[in-house]
């Protein structure tokens, strides 16, 4: 009887206990952004890094933004160490709040970190292993110090991290490349593929997000930049979609055309590994949003000329990007290798180790670019003919 009573009491104690690992919400430091900078390169492959965490300021959350004594919606805490894990531990000594990463939105890594072979992988590995992190955290490279971006005070958001997160989310509709996310980078690291990462910078006290860094897959070291125009070409090749605009010249005047739909198809047309050749076709649809000049846009002749101008400009943009990536960087961030791997796997097995390294078949291949542009609307009041009728 005593044993049964003791057993009942022990079972009851389990239900009476609280959460052993419980941390009260007021003791949590909600980290929404993290910046990693290189402070010093040491010998024996060691580096001193600066880790900056951006925490939400709970006091500011309850203060009206128009109040005279309104506080910043965030606070930044920085520590340096040779180990990011150790730096994270140090962080706890600088605040009474326990860093909580489940609401992390963005990770910013400076170009200086990516300039060192393998360092970017080591940095990201710390975040990949963090069980609190969601796999959709966005990763950006910064032109200068990463923690400087976290000091930017946005007008419409409480924190620069949340502003950058929303800027990236809206980027798809603005014709910008989608950011890399942790789960995607983890897969890239495993297969040692060359890749690009969107870059952000501060210009005239504004965050600018319009170009990318190109990274060698074998050692995860940055090799160069694609500027804003080259990045648009990259977008047409790798991530065509709706959104964004392109400017064309018609009748001596500028025309802005919004992208309503864009698709790209890449095919391997010559399977001789010493003379690999691809065809790349971009199908572009757009509507004219802005036009300066007196030309009548409703005539068939005008539309044909505008479409021809668009085709010429897009083709030039795409070819310039291919030229830079193929001949200067010699790294396949354009996903041509994916076309061979998917459609011609037997061939891929014979060249994979020398695709964009060694013999570098990628840099030796040729690409024939074709663009077909179709204007589907000249504006709200000038709906034009259906494509089928124009083709008659």
Residue ranges and their predicted role:
Residues 2, 10-392:
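Membrane-proximal alpha-helical signals and transmembrane carboxylates
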């Amino acid at each position: 009887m005593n044993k049964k009573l003791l057993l009942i009491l022990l079972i009851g104690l389990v239900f009476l206990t609280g959460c052993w690992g419980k941390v009260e919400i007021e003791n949590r430091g909600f980290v929404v952004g993290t910046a990693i900078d290189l402070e010093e390169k040491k010998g024996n492959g060691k580096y001193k890094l600066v880790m900056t965490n951006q925490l939400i300021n709970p006091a500011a959350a309850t203060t009206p933004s128009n109040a005279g004594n309104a506080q910043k919606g965030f606070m930044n805490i920085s520590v340096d160490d040779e180990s990011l894990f150790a730096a994270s531990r140090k962080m706890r000594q600088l605040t009474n709040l326990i860093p909580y990463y489940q609401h992390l939105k963005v990770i910013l890594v400076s170009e200086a970190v990516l300039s060192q072979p393998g360092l970017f992988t080591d940095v990201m590995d710390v975040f990949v292993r963090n069980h609190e992190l969601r796999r959709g955290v966005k990763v950006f490279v910064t032109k200068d110090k990463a923690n400087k971006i976290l000091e930017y005070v946005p007008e419409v958001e409480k924190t620069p991290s949340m502003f950058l997160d929303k800027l990236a989310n809206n980027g798809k509709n603005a014709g910008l490349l989608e950011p890399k996310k942790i789960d995607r980078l983890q897969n890239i690291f495993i297969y040692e593929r060359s890749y690009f990462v969107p870059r952000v910078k501060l210009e005239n006290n504004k965050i600018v997000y319009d170009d990318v860094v190109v990274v060698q897959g074998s050692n995860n070291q940055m090799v160069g930049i694609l500027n804003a125009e080259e990045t648009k070409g990259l977008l047409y090749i790798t991530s065509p979609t709706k959104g964004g605009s392109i400017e064309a010249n018609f009748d001596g005047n500028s025309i802005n055309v919004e992208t309503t739909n864009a698709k790209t198809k890449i095919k391997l047309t010559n399977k001789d590994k010493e003379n690999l050749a691809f065809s790349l076709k971009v199908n572009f649809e757009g509507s004219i949003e802005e036009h300066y000049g007196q030309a009548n846009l409703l005539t068939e002749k005008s539309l044909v000329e505008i479409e021809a101008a668009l085709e010429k400009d897009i083709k030039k943009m795409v070819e310039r990007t291919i030229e830079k990536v193929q001949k200067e960087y010699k790294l396949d961030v354009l996903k041509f290798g994916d076309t061979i791997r998917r459609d011609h796997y037997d061939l891929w097995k014979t060249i994979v180790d020398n695709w964009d390294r060694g013999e570098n078949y990628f840099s030796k291949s040729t690409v024939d670019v074709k663009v077909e542009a179709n204007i589907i609307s000249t504006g709200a009041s000038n709906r034009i003919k259906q494509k089928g009728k124009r083709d008659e």
